[in-house]
């Protein structure tokens, strides 16, 4: 670099270092974007901007990547390490050389023709100062966030938006591959430049999103739609009001529903949330975000479908997506959050509000469906919670399918962009509403959201530990429907909302698939692992060595026989994990002369069931295997497989587990092999025995499934006692008996007698043909399950269930058989 050029860049670099604090996307470009600094590397930027180039240089030096200002010397030929795709205005037009991207590409390709060993990585990089998409009324102005700026505009962009800047590294393109597969002549270089322009245009759309509508223009367009016109006429006729009054009602509903997205609100909230997260959370862990970026760049309409743990979810997900270089979505939020001042703030951050029920209000349901369809048509990403509300137990709830149905109906309008559903697992080490959830499960009335409740909640925000956002396996709707409902395209109608016969069963299956994929991306952490161990112990307490041994067992199970490829397990030793958990002040440590005892008080144990339930599905099968082996020393493998095969459909329905019946057998074999490797099980030919040297670890693992089996025993006991029980009565009596059992045996889990759990169980009994179409129990199948369950439950609990069955339905012979 010449002396004058060095002075020029140095002078330009000084103010940039003061004004610019750019974020790198992805966070680790070497690992996540596949950049290898050992190979020759060339950077490709969209616009001729020295500010962009020097911002890129700052990040390259931080990330250990080659300096873009250092030329490449190849076979005695010196070439620039960067290229601008577009020429344009510069601060010093008399000084800066004209960009000649096609000529430079051709020179590089020519070097590859003469040197077969050469392979230069061409790395596309976008540098963004601000990401405002602009408003649709600004038709004469191109989107400002990545457009070509003159020197004065760029100066003010850096001055105002330097702290809201992003450097986005894309995966490199191998120029060796281009030269080998496509040749090295100038037409290939021209094609490469054209493809680069398309790539950067897509990235601009991914980063900023489509233009935002003027709200009144959006309302006018919705009012003009045929569906809403008809709904307005029906409203006027049914309520005996004028059409003008019905239209006014429609506009009021639109005002209630529609978001008022503001980029400035997003920027301000990012500052506030960055400050907040850094003080409340010890870390935010994001996995598989590259999947979503790839989908967005390929032009997919993305619908984010997270699990719902807390009111924090809304803010956390938008924050994470923004920092992953993606547009924060329009979020379906419950109408209960539309209170001052939260409602107006959420609305500007992209929230649109939805009532709990649409029943009896055709105008509302039509407007909501048309608004959702309009969001898809305009290309905005959308987020909704398919569970319909926050989980009070820590488990996934049965999905509510209304919004999902509307999503598929929007696709049946015949839009051009493919719609893809992205399941998201959200996990916390501390959920501020957990104590409230426990009260509600015990029968307390749900507190209404409002300013006072929000202020009380803010006071509780402290030491939230780690947060986890894991993006699951995406579900492309068109692909899924083509496989499951080949004739689905016959139902496409650009005008009317369609309800073909296949829609309801398809929606139910898609919803269940999404729940399974959310669980497939679960995050184990210090709190849910330690809670799982301590809650399995009889007195909710363990010595430190026993607790560490159990954590080591769980770590090895989750790492060596992972539940699913997308689950995450802490990269810590058991000792480090326990130290972190104790620092969260959720566990009590008692000291004596022998050593430490880690405990949970009775009240705290109730709250910790929430965190245990977050990952219960990860450990339930290993626990069931351990339980059967402990209860049947010397059991044949085939018998163990047979028992688990019978019990598994109940677990699968309750916990949204991923394995089909065909996949179950090899999974069980893998778990047995892992337990044997850990020295917990002694496998002798076809028989399985508990290993006496580590019996305590195996028994504690087995205890994790204890409460689940007790619940099943209650329901099957009632069925056996009275095969004619109808489903509603069976659910009710099961809950009553579960409450009795929890009092008599100190069961602290609020979900033990949760209505939804028994409702799912009874529905599964019908699906698995334990109950006939007429509602009667199938004696042989029920008796077989009763026999299996009676062998896995302790005599004291079994006695309580038997006595309760006697009181409810008479003969003792109808209850579970005693040991």
UniProtKB/Swiss-Prot annotation:
<dbReference type="InterPro" id="IPR022284">
    <property type="entry name" value="GPAT/DHAPAT"/>
</dbReference>
<keyword id="KW-0472">Membrane</keyword>
<dbReference type="InterPro" id="IPR028354">
    <property type="entry name" value="GPAT_PlsB"/>
</dbReference>
<dbReference type="GO" id="GO:0006631">
    <property type="term" value="P:fatty acid metabolic process"/>
</dbReference>
<comment type="pathway">
    <text>Phospholipid metabolism; CDP-diacylglycerol biosynthesis; CDP-diacylglycerol from sn-glycerol 3-phosphate: step 1/3.</text>
</comment>
<keyword id="KW-0012">Acyltransferase</keyword>
<protein>
    <recommendedName>
        <fullName>Glycerol-3-phosphate acyltransferase</fullName>
        <ecNumber>2.3.1.15</ecNumber>
    </recommendedName>
</protein>
<comment type="similarity">
    <text>Belongs to the GPAT/DAPAT family.</text>
</comment>
<dbReference type="GO" id="GO:0005886">
    <property type="term" value="C:plasma membrane"/>
</dbReference>
<keyword id="KW-0594">Phospholipid biosynthesis</keyword>
<keyword id="KW-1003">Cell membrane</keyword>
<dbReference type="InterPro" id="IPR041728">
    <property type="entry name" value="GPAT/DHAPAT_LPLAT"/>
</dbReference>
<dbReference type="GO" id="GO:0004366">
    <property type="term" value="F:glycerol-3-phosphate O-acyltransferase activity"/>
</dbReference>
<dbReference type="InterPro" id="IPR045520">
    <property type="entry name" value="GPAT/DHAPAT_C"/>
</dbReference>
<dbReference type="Pfam" id="PF01553">
    <property type="entry name" value="Acyltransferase"/>
</dbReference>
<dbReference type="GO" id="GO:0016024">
    <property type="term" value="P:CDP-diacylglycerol biosynthetic process"/>
</dbReference>
<keyword id="KW-0808">Transferase</keyword>
<feature type="short sequence motif" description="HXXXXD motif">
    <location>
        <begin position="307"/>
        <end position="312"/>
    </location>
</feature>
<keyword id="KW-0444">Lipid biosynthesis</keyword>
<keyword id="KW-0443">Lipid metabolism</keyword>
<keyword id="KW-0997">Cell inner membrane</keyword>
<dbReference type="InterPro" id="IPR002123">
    <property type="entry name" value="Plipid/glycerol_acylTrfase"/>
</dbReference>
<dbReference type="Pfam" id="PF19277">
    <property type="entry name" value="GPAT_C"/>
</dbReference>
<keyword id="KW-1208">Phospholipid metabolism</keyword>
């Amino acid at each position: 670099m010449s002396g004058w050029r060095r002075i020029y860049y140095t002078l330009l670099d000084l103010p940039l270092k003061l004004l610019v604090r750019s974020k790198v996307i992805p966070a680790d470009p070497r690992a996540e974007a596949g950049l290898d600094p050992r190979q020759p590397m060339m950077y490709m930027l969209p616009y001729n901007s020295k500010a962009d180039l020097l911002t890129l240089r700052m990040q390259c030096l931080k990330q250990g990547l080659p300096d873009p200002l250092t030329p490449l010397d190849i076979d005695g030929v010196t070439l620039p390490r960067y290229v601008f795709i577009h020429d344009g205005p510069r601060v010093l037009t008399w000084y800066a050389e004209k960009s000649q991207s096609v000529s430079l590409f051709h020179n590089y390709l020519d070097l590859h023709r003469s040197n077969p060993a050469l392979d230069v990585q061409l790395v596309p990089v976008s540098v963004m100062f601000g990401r405002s998409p602009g408003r649709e009324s600004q038709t004469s102005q191109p989107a400002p966030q990545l457009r070509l700026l003159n020197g004065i505009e760029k100066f003010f962009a850096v001055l105002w938006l330097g702290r809201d800047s992003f450097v986005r590294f894309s995966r490199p393109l191998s120029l060796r591959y281009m030269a080998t597969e496509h040749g090295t002549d100038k037409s290939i270089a021209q094609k490469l430049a054209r493809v680069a322009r398309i790539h950067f245009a897509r990235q601009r759309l991914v980063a900023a999103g489509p233009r935002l509508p003027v709200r009144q223009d959006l309302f006018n367009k919705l009012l003009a739609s045929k569906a809403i016109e008809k709904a307005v006429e029906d409203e006027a006729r049914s309520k005996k009001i004028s059409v003008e009054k019905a239209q006014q009602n429609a506009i009021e509903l639109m005002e209630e529903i529609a978001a008022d997205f503001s980029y400035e609100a997003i920027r301000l909230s990012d500052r506030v949330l960055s400050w907040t997260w850094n003080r409340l959370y010890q870390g935010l862990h994001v996995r598989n975000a590259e999947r979503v970026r790839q989908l967005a760049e390929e032009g997919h309409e993305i619908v984010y479908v997270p699990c719902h743990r807390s009111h924090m979810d809304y803010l956390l997900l938008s924050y994470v997506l923004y920092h992953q270089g993606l547009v924060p979505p329009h979020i379906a939020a419950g109408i209960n959050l539309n209170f001052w001042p939260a409602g107006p703030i959420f609305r500007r951050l992209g929230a649109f509000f939805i009532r709990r029920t649409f029943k009896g209000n055709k105008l509302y349901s039509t407007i909501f469906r048309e608004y959702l369809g309009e969001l898809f048509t305009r290309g905005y990403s959308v987020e909704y919670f398919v569970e319909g509300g926050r989980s009070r137990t820590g488990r996934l709830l049965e999905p509510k399918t209304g919004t999902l149905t509307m999503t598929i109906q929007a696709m049946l309008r015949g839009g051009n962009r493919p719609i893809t559903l992205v399941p998201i697992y959200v996990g916390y080490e501390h959920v501020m509403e957990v104590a409230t959830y426990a009260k509600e499960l015990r029968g307390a009335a749900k507190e209404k959201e409002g300013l006072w409740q929000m202020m009380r909640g803010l006071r509780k925000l402290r030491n939230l530990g780690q947060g986890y956002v894991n993006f699951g396996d995406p579900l492309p709707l068109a692909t899924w429907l083509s496989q499951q409902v080949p004739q689905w395209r016959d139902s496409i109608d650009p005008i009317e909302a369609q309800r073909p016969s296949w829609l309801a069963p398809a929606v139910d299956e898609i919803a269940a698939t999404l729940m399974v994929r959310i669980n497939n991306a679960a995050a184990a952490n210090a709190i849910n692992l330690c809670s799982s161990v301590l809650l399995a112990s009889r007195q909710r307490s363990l010595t430190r060595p026993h607790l560490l041994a159990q954590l080591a067992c769980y770590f090895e199970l989750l790492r060596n026989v992972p539940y699913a490829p997308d689950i995450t397990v802490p990269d810590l030793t058991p000792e480090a994990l326990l130290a972190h958990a104790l620092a969260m002040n959720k566990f009590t440590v008692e000291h004596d002369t022998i050593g430490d005892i880690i405990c949970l008080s009775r009240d705290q144990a109730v709250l910790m069931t929430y965190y245990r339930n977050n990952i219960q599905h990860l450990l339930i099968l290993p626990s069931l295997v351990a339980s059967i082996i402990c209860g049947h020393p010397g059991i044949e493998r085939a018998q163990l497989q047979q028992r688990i095969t019978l019990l598994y459909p109940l677990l699968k329905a309750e916990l949204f587990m991923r394995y089909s019946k065909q996949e179950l057998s090899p999974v069980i074999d893998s778990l047995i092999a892992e337990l044997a490797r850990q020295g917990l099980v002694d496998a002798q030919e076809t028989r399985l025995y508990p290993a006496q040297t580590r019996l305590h670890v195996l028994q504690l693992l087995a205890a994790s499934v204890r409460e689940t089996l007790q619940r099943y025993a209650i329901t099957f006991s009632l069925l056996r006692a009275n095969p004619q029980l109808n489903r509603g009565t069976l659910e009710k009596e099961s809950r009553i008996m579960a409450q009795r059992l929890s009092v008599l045996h100190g069961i602290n889990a609020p979900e033990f007698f949760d209505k939804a759990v028994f409702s799912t169980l009874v529905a599964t009994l019908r699906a698995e043909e334990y109950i006939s179409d007429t509602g009667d129990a199938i004696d042989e199948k029920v008796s077989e399950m009763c026999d299996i369950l009676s062998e896995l439950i302790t005599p004291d609990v079994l006695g309580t269930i038997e006595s309760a069955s006697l009181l409810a339905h008479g003969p003792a012979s109808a209850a579970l058989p005693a040991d």
